[in-house]
Amino acid sequence: SLMEVYLPPFYAATKAGTGSMMTAFNDIAGVPSTANEYLIDDVLRAEWGFDGMIVSDWNAVAELINHGVAETEEQAGKLALQAGVDMDMTSMVLPTKIKAAVQSDACLAHDLDAAVARILTTKERLGLFDTPMAYHDPEREKTTLLKDEFRRAARHAAVKSMVLLKNEKQTLPLSSSPQTIAVIGGLAEDKLTQLGSWRAQGKTDDVVSLLEGLQRNAPSGTTVTYAAGTHPSSEVRGAIQQAVDTAMDADQVLLVIGEDFDLSGEARSRSDIALPPSQSELAQAIFATGKPVTVILVTGRPLALED
């Protein structure tokens, strides 16, 4: 599964010319990614030919202690460097502890030299030796962020990544003939969730929600109605009946359910992979209408849809 399912996207990224990779927090077969020499040196570098820089995830070098594979920060830094990690993101283990590690193990100097060489090579490729402030031009933000080319690429990636789980009754594609389409579910207009749980500098003002996109692009003569019903993070159920009424007045129902940005993400995912109770109750009420329903699942991880 590792080679056939999980690694192919990363292999494709290396062949597309990516300049750096980041190790994950998790372990593979008991070995933390940040100390995984097999993944970094054997697979990524030797087998795939990647010659870029490897950076750890946030504080991941220090957290090798939490994984139980290192007792001290010096040991953690040594493990990461030997595995092929070049740059330590924020934990400051490599900058502060690696000198002592090299003094106690001279063989580590070779790994250190290789890491430094890869970092300097990356800087050279970026032109930072000639123009150190090249990426600090305030005008660059205005001309680069969200440019049309990047939006098109993001849209293309989103379209390619969508999965149609089943279409047994041939509900899709929806007819372009005049009709009423009811969009049900608070996630349909949740722009924060569209940005995701780790959205960096993303702004909701730049997001086109699912509901907005449908309203803007609906065929002539098609009416798009909306009812939130419930939201994944809300315990309020009072609006479910309004959603049912809206669905009953429609020809087709698009039911948008799942988890919002606060229920699925780094260090915040629920322990249960079933739908949040409010979402399950909304779905059952809408299915009971007997209307043709298309479920649009919004989630940052796999969910069990047993109901």
Which residue ranges define each predicted feature?
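Glycoside hydrolase catalytic-domain context in secreted enzymes
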Residues: 1-307
